[in-house]
Amino acid sequence: MSDRHLYGSDHSYLSSKPSCSSCRRQSSTSQKNECMTNPGSIVLTQRWTVCNFESLLKLSRPGSCLRSTVFKDDAVPDACWQLCLYPGGKREENANNVSLFLKMSATSPSKEVVLKAEYRFYFLDDNDEPKFSNVNVGEFHAKPPKGGHSWGLRNIPTQKVQNSIRQDKSLVISCHIELIPDASKVPCKRVPITPSIEMPFAQIPRAHVESELEMLASGDGTDMTIVAGPLDGEREQFRVHAYKLRAHSDVFQMMLSHTEMRENQEKRIEILDFSPTSVRAMVEFIYAGVIKSDIDVYQAVDVMQIAEKYQILALKMTCEQHLLDRLNVNNVLECITHAERYNTDVLYDACVDFAIHNRQHVMALTSWRNFISDEPVLASNLLEKMVKSNDNSSPPVKKPRV
């Protein structure tokens, strides 16, 4: 756990009042407007084995062409690709050389296609290591009626190719193509804002944190026992000072200020509905203003719930920051649910923004259907925001003129 979590802010400067939907936190958030255009590259590869190439190299005449199978990518449906190999050279002037070309063809003979691509040729040895390589960039322009355009190498010295022939007399060619589809059709998307809670108080000195936790561990001068855990499960006792509990929780203050309360008479507080881990985190925070225990996302939710129950707002905000720092596609729906349940505005807004930006991945989760059935109001609100964001993310792309 980082020092930011271990040696956090002194919650004694922050009022621990009950939270509700109408309450607004005392923290400040840093807001900024940011967008991103991501024209992703498409990479195609073709591996082609030409058997008995040693004989082909000796006996092929100029103009004799071998062709690979046609390959394509569904993201570029208008174009397909093929390798063309001339063991004896493409023309008479290319004799004693090998010619290799990459051909792009339009999938529709009546359609004009223009693509700029980087293409790489490799001849691979028996260990699949490149013995020959070449990199070029070309603009492929296929237009009717021919419908195809080639770029490549006319004069690869025969000696270089011979050095690449494998022990089984074959030649293995690997071709890598990288291209970007029409970038003008790539929408610009708003970058989700994941705000950071800036605690409105000073940093706690490390020595103070350590001395407070040492006092808790020693049990010196304690006058109260907290028993945590269900009656039929794992339980743990914590020896604490009553004044610490009263100072940082309105609920404990009310409980321990009345002599007729059972907890005050028995000097014992039973917490049956939370695990010892969650109670330990709460007690550590009451003493030192930090959560020393290493807690995961699910435990942070439990600690946030116990902070809500005992009205320790600073602890609740610390858990909120813990969840913000670990927000991802797999837990965003669960975090939205908890943020709504415990009235954590910053976490809720960040989760919604994150879910909108990653809506395709979020809606593909197996938990998405459960979220719709279990939280229909939340799901409806989120879907509405997703639709509005999609409508406003980018102006409509103009259709090209025919």
Swiss-Prot record:
Protein name per Swiss-Prot or TrEMBL: BTB and MATH domain-containing protein 40
Purpose: Probable substrate-specific adapter of an E3 ubiquitin-protein ligase complex which mediates the ubiquitination and subsequent proteasomal degradation of target proteins.
A GO BP annotation: protein ubiquitination
Gene Ontology molecular function, alphabetical: ubiquitin protein ligase binding
GO cellular component: cytoplasm; nucleus
Keywords linked to the UniProt accession: Ubl conjugation pathway
Gene3D superfamilies, A to Z: 1.25.40.420, Apoptosis, Tumor Necrosis Factor Receptor Associated Protein 2, Chain A (2.60.210.10), Potassium Channel Kv1.1, Chain A (3.30.710.10)
Subunit-structure text: Interacts with cul-3.
Bias (Low complexity) ranges: 15-25
The BTB domain, residue ranges: 222-295
Record gene name: bath-40
Segments of this protein annotated with the region Disordered: 1-25
Database matches in SUPFAM superfamilies: POZ domain, TRAF domain-like
Signal peptide (residue range): none
Pathway(s) the chain acts in: Protein modification; protein ubiquitination
All residue ranges annotated as the MATH domain in the record: 43-177
